Amino acid sequence: MEIRERDGLARIARFDTPHGTIETPTVLPVINPNIMDITPEEMKKYGVHGVITNSYIILRNDRLREEAEKYGVHSLIGYDGPVMTDSGTFQSYVYGSVEFNNRQVVEFQKTIGSDILTILDIFTTPSSSRQEVENAITETYRRMLEVNDAGGMIAGPIQGGIYPDLRKRSAELMNSTNASYLPIGGVVPLLESYEYDKLVDIILNSKLNVSFGKPIHLFGGGHPMFFAFAVYLGVDLFDSASYVKYAKDDRLIYPDGTRDLARIIEIPEWSPLFDKYTVKELKELPKEQRSVELSRHNLKAIFMEISEIRERIYEESMDQYLAQKAKSHPSLLKAYVKVMQYSKMLEKYQDLFKKAAYFFYDSFSTKNTYVARLEKFTSKYLTSKKKETYVFSRKDWLPGYTNLNFVRDVYERTECNALIPWSGIMVPAELENTYPIEQTVSSGLEPDPDVSAISESISPFDIRVYKGESVDSDKIRSFDLEKIRTIADYQFGYGIGKDFFKDDVRIFKSKTGRIRGVFDKGNKLIATLRNDGFFTLTFHGATLLYNVSKSPNLRVFVKNESAEYNAKGYSVFFKFILDADPDIIAKNETLVVNENGELVAVGKATVSGKELREYSDGIAVKIHEGRDQSAK
C-alpha cells in the first residue's frame, strides 16, 4: 500500500495489480458471470477501480470454466481492470460443502489470471460457538499455509466470529503468512441485522493486529450506510452485490439508508435516473428492465458515498463526518458510542493537528481522541508539578483570549498551575493556542467541566477558582516562557520543555501578541510557531532536541544511502527506514538519524510511529531542513 492521504486510521492509498492500480477506499462490485445487466466496462463511469467475481461459480459451470481457462477471467467478464476472485466460502456455508478443495480453488484462480486470489476459508457466523470459531481459525490458517507459495496477491480472510480475542488471534496468524491482502470475513449477518457496534470491535481487533502495509477488505460490507464508520476504523475496500439484490426487490440505496420504490415521490437529482424517468414511469417499467435501472441508481449511491469519504479524508474531517452519520440511524449512534470507547486506543493514530477545525457538537464530543490525548497530558501536567491550581470559567478565559490580568497579577508572581475549560474538560492555559483548543467551532453545548475530576491528580485543597485577585509579590517567571515550555512538553514529551528552552532564550512576538520566534544565543530554534500552535524546528532546534531527548524518542532511523539525500533536504521514503519510535505522532516534528546514530535532518512525519515501520511505498517524513542546508 502506498498512502496518499490520511485522517487517523482512514486513508487514501493505492496498490498495484497486474491489471492496474486500485485506489482506496473503494468498492469492488460483485459480478455474476452468468448475468451481467450492467457490464464492468459501464461501471467505470461510476468510479469503479476493480471488480470481484466468484471463481466457484465459474469452476462448476463447464462453459464458463472452459472460456476462463482459455481466455482468462478478464475476457470472460469483459473487463480489463483489476479482478478479485472469491473462493466459494459463502456457498460452502450455505450448502454445507463444495466439491473442490482449497488447493484446487486457488490453482484455478491462478490459471484464469485473477489479480487477487482468495483461499477457501471456513465461514463462521455470530451464532457460532467459541470452539467452532477456534477450529475455523486453525483450519483457515492451515489452508493459507497450504498455498503460501502460490505467488501473486493472495487474500487471507480474518475470521473470529464475535470474539475480539479470536479476531486478534486470526489477524496475527494471517499477517504472519504470505497473505498480502486481508479481508475481514463472517460479518454479513451482523450487517444485515444492523449490529454495527459489534462490527466496531471486530474491525479494530483485526486492523490493529496486522501490518498497515496490507489492504483491509470488509467482506460483504456493500451498503454505504456503514462505509464511513468502517473507513474511519481502517477498512480500505468493500465488495457489493447489494446494488443488484436491492434493485430486484424494488429498493433504492441512499447514502444514509434504503427506501422502497413504492414509497418515494421524487428521484434524487444525483441519480442517473433523474432526467430519464419520473417515479411513475419507473414503477411501470417491466420488472427486469426496472431492476437494471435501479441497479444503476444503487451503484451511483454507493460510489457517491465513497467519493464523499475520500473528500473527507483529504479535508481531515472524518471525525465530523462520523458524528453527522451517527445521527442518521439509531444503530449507527450505538456504533458511534462504541467507537468513542476506543478513543484512548485510537489517539496514537490521530494527527497532531488537522486542516479542518475541531467541531464540538454535544456530549459525545467529550469522548473524542483529542480529548483523550489532552486529558492524559493534563494529568501529567498536574501530577508532576503538584502546586496551587487556578481554574477558570469560560467567561474569564477563552482559548486565544488570554486573561492578561491573571497572567500579570498571579501567574507570573507565583508557581501556580492554570487550567481553562475546553470541550467539557480542563486543560493547561499554556496550551490555549494549540490545536484543537483554539481551533474549535462549538455548538455552545459543552458541559461545565467537572473540577472535582482534577482532584485525582492534585489535592482538592490546592484548587482555586479565579475571582480577579492579585498576589502582592515580585515577578518570578514569564508566562511566554512557560507557554513554549508546556507546548514542547506536549509536542515532544513531558519534561523536554525546560531543557529545550533555557531561561535565557529570546522570544519574539507579533504585533498581535503571538509568539513567532525563539532564539538561543543568536540561533533560531523554531522556524515558526504555526497557526495550529505547534513548533516547526530549524536544524539547530532539532540538534538541541536530539541532545535533550533519549533515543529512540522522536527518531526515525534510516539507511545511510537515504541519509545522504535527507541531509540535503530530500524527503525520507518508507523503504529506507530501519526503525522508528513507535510513539511518533503523525505531523509531529521527527528527527532523522543515520545508521551511525547521527542527526541528518528534521521533518514532519506523514504517519504514526507504528505505520512508519510497516509501509514500504511513499513518503514517510517530509524534510524541512537538512544538516547540509543548515551548514550553508
Swiss-Prot record:
GO terms for cellular component: cytoplasm. It holds the Pfam family TGT_C2. Signal peptide: none annotated. Binds 1 zinc ion per subunit. One of its GO terms (biological process) is tRNA wobble guanine modification. Exchanges the guanine residue with 7-cyano-7-deazaguanine (preQ0) at position 15 in the dihydrouridine loop (D-loop) of archaeal tRNAs. Belongs to the archaeosine tRNA-ribosyltransferase family. This is tRNA-guanine(15) transglycosylase. It comes from Thermoplasma volcanium (strain ATCC 51530 / DSM 4299 / JCM 9571 / NBRC 15438 / GSS1).
